[in-house]
């Protein structure tokens, strides 16, 4: 159970009182090889495969701003809870993927963070599976700021996407 408590200070609503923004629905990651990425997130990280879809057609072209766009999309989640957002893995078909070097200091999504209750065991397992870890688990104490204590480390998926593992203490 997470020990952190976050408070929404302002709720954004539309004219009819409808919530404009709700919970995070999923986190999308563009990958070069969907099958390889599914294997990593499922077999190494232990996420549950929820399914795969093929996106094609006019709506797909419009949402991705690309003509004749096709994408294989898979969903994996570590939780059965509908409130927990899944990882959405996207492999574009017949379109060249530009691979960029992840940079924690560039404006972008810096990392996708996963929760664990045994960070040392996860770290050892990732090392055994030849996963590139950017450091060993590190200790953080943000108690005075209201966020508590934790241990965390960054690591990379098969495409070099930076991920984080965190254990609240």
Name each model-derived stretch.
Residues 5-7:
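Short hydrophobic alpha-helical segments enriched in small aliphatic residues
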Residues 9-19:
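Short, Lys/Arg-enriched N-terminal segments with co-localized hydrophobic residues
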Residues 17-19, 24-32, 52, 74-93, 98-169:
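Vicinal oxygen chelate
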Residues 30-83, 148:
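Core segments of cupin and vicinal oxygen chelate
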Residues 39-55, 85-91, 122-137:
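Conserved long hydrophobic alpha-helices within structured protein cores
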Residues 57-62, 95-100, 140-146:
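A short, acidic/glycine-rich surface segment
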């Amino acid at each position: 159970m997470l020990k952190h408590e976050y408070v929404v200070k302002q709720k954004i609503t539309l004219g009819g009182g409808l919530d404009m923004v709700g919970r995070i629905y999923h986190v999308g990651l563009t990958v070069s090889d969907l099958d390889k990425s599914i294997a990593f997130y499922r077999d190494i990280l232990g996420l549950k495969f929820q399914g795969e879809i093929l996106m094609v057609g006019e709506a797909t072209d419009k949402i991705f701003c690309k003509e004749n766009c096709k994408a294989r999309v898979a969903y994996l989640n570590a939780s059965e809870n509908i409130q927990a957002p899944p990882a959405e893995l996207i492999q574009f078909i017949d379109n060249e993927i530009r691979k960029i070097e992840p940079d924690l200091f560039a404006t972008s999504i810096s990392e996708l963070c996963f929760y664990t209750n045994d960070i040392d065991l996860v770290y050892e397992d990732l090392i055994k599976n030849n996963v590139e870890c950017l450091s060993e688990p590190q200790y953080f104490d943000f108690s005075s700021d209201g966020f508590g204590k934790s241990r965390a480390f960054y690591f990379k998926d098969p495409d070099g996407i930076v991920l984080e593992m965190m254990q609240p203490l």
